[in-house]
């Protein structure tokens, strides 16, 4: 699925479904009740937390994650998958993403 410049919350759901549907979990909800999703991949003892779009209008890292995830899931990366568990939150601020603003729905910059 091609990812354009801006990735609103509804498009994020499409990407999550296509990339790794079994590992998705809702970990919370935004001020405006949009789900905040996390993907867990890998089985190793080394844990890595990755998140993006803390600022809703900055989706470049989100798109990079969706390039990274298929690479990590490739069978060539089995050793890495066995050593690491990745917790990926691809859109930390879905309200800001929906509005295309840096702040969340409460006008708070999440930095």
Where are each of the predicted segments found?
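Short beta-strand-to-loop junctions in surface cap/lid or active-site-entrance loops
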Residues: 37-45, 53
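Short active-site segment of divalent metal-dependent hydrolases/proteases
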Residues: 56
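Short, charged beta->alpha transition segments
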Residues: 35-38, 75-76
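Short glycine- and acidic-rich boundary segments immediately preceding or forming the N-terminal edge
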Residues: 1-36
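Active-site/substrate-binding loop(s) of hydrolase catalytic cores
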Residues: 45-51, 59-111
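Residues at the C-termini of beta-strands that transition into short coil/loop
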Residues: 28, 42, 92
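Short glycine/proline-enriched coil/turn segments at helix->beta-strand junctions
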Residues: 20-23, 43-47
């Amino acid at each position: 699925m091609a990812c354009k410049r801006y990735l609103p919350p509804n498009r994020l759901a499409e990407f999550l479904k296509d990339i790794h549907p079994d590992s998705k979990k809702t970990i919370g909800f935004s001020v405006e009740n949009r789900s905040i999703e996390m993907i867990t991949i890998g089985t190793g003892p080394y844990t890595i937390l990755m998140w993006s779009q803390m600022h809703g209008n900055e989706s470049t890292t989100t798109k990079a994650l969706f390039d990274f995830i298929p690479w990590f899931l490739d069978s060539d990366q089995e050793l890495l998958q066995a050593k690491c568990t990745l917790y990926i939150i691809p859109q930390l601020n879905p309200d800001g993403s929906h509005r295309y603003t840096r702040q969340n729905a409460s006008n708070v910059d999440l930095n």
